[in-house]
Amino acid sequence: MVGVVIVSHSLKAAEGIKEIAQQMGRDVPVAAVGGTADGQIGTDPLAIKEAIEGVMGSDGVLLLVDLGSAVLNTQLAVEMLEDEGQDQVVLSNAPILEGAVVAVVESAMGHNLEQVKKAAEEAIHMEKLL
Amino acid sequence: MVETTLKIKNKSGLHLRPAAEFVKKANEFQANITLERGGKVVNGKSIIHVQALGVRQGMTINLRAVGVDAEDAVAALSELVNNKFGEE
């Protein structure tokens, strides 16, 4: 199964999103990471790298981020991975919460990294009120 | 096309977890699967669509499937809904 990493400026936000997303598939590896090394609002590339490694399996990992520096530090974290790991990690443009929910459902269905990424990014166009 | 009308009996309706169960089951079939409620039709294989339908307890939905395994798909999904997704 494709792993999912949720990167937010707030660890609480990341953990909350993880909690919701895991309702959709208990077996999918999901990691929540957020906050700076000294516990402030922000992101920490080293912590993100460790979170990626924690859920890395043979099917790869989808990365979901909130805003701004979370994107930059996640890209930095990917660069810090071993070369073979970098090929199996994809940063998603999906909205963090909706994308996480979709990604976990898709991963639980056994879809591959490309399929999971595509489905999560369709959440950009999600209508909350039909 | 195979079609059936289902009444949602589980307490929380097609909220996140049941919607996910529905979508996972729907994806086991080749058939094109749609759900309809109040004139709104959505793709039954998409979690984004199914949960957005806002189906609550007591509502009825139309389930339609088109394709080689449409009958099996409708039977399996009906069973899931009628068994309240294993909930109350």
What are these model-derived regions, one by one?
Chain B
Residues 1-5, 60-62:
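Intrinsic-disorder/low-complexity, polar/charged segments enriched in Ser/Thr/Lys/Arg/Asp/Glu/Gln
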Residues 7-48, 52-57, 87:
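Compact, glycine-rich, soluble single-domain proteins
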Residues 3, 7-9, 73:
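Intrinsic disorder
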Residues 52-88:
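C-terminal structural segments of small proteins and small subunits
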